[in-house]
Structures are given as C-alpha cells and as structure tokens.
C-alpha cells in the first residue's frame, strides 16, 4: 500500500494534462504576437491546476511553455538540471499548427 509520499512522477498523467491545456488554449488559433502572453499563462495555469488535483503533495512542479511563430527557420531547445534521477521526473510535449509551435515542459522535484 503506497502512501501519498511514495507516489511516483507519472509521465502519462502529466502528458494528458498538458496536451489538454494546449488544446483548450490554442485550438483553431492563428499566431498573434500580442496573444502569446495570454496563451502561455492559460496553458501554465491550466496545467498547474490539473496537476495539483492529482493530490501528489510529495512533488514541487515547474511548468515552462514556449510559443513561437513558424517562419521556416529551425529551432533547438534543451533543458538540464541536477537532481535525483531515481525520484524526480520530467516530460515535454510539442504541439504545432500551420502558424506556430508550442513546447511545454513539466519538471517534478520530489520533496
């Protein structure tokens, strides 16, 4: 029987949440520079709210969201940190449409 403290970082649950957040916020949108701050905040807020509803109080979560216009140029992104690989976790989700890219990363650090 696992306790709340023993719960692992479950990538599949987190991915479902961030995919939903992106679809809700960006579905049927066209890139507009002035809207990016609202879109990123909406995605982050929705993700954190749903992640907190998982009731896994043994983690602190960090959510990062990048939205940028498709211009034909390539891009590369990477994240790195020093942590306990046995207990901490992370996942990322990449979404795109005809006018923009969106990359969301979630880090779960066990307390």
Curated annotation (Swiss-Prot):
GO terms for biological process: microtubule-based movement. Keywords: Cytoplasm, Cytoskeleton, Dynein, Microtubule, Motor protein. Pfam families: Tctex-1 (PF03645). The keyword DNA repair does not apply. GO terms for molecular function: dynein intermediate chain binding. One of its GO terms (cellular component) is microtubule. InterPro entries: Tctex-1-like (IPR005334), Tctex-1-like_sf (IPR038586). The keyword Zinc-finger does not apply. It is found in: Cytoplasm, Cytoskeleton. Its main location: cytoplasm. Belongs to the dynein light chain Tctex-type family. Acts as a non-catalytic accessory component of a dynein complex. This is Dynein light chain Tctex-type.
């Amino acid at each position: 029987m696992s306790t709340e403290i023993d719960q692992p970082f479950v990538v599949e649950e987190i991915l479902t949440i961030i995919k939903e957040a992106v679809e809700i916020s960006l579905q049927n949108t066209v890139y507009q520079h002035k809207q990016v701050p609202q879109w990123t905040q909406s995605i982050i807020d929705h993700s954190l709210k749903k992640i907190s509803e998982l009731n896994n109080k043994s983690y602190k979560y960090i959510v990062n969201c990048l939205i940028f216009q498709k211009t034909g140029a390539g891009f590369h992104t990477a994240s790195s940190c020093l942590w306990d690989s046995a207990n901490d976790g992370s996942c990322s989700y990449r979404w795109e449409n005809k006018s923009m890219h969106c990359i969301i990363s979630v880090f779960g650090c066990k307390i």
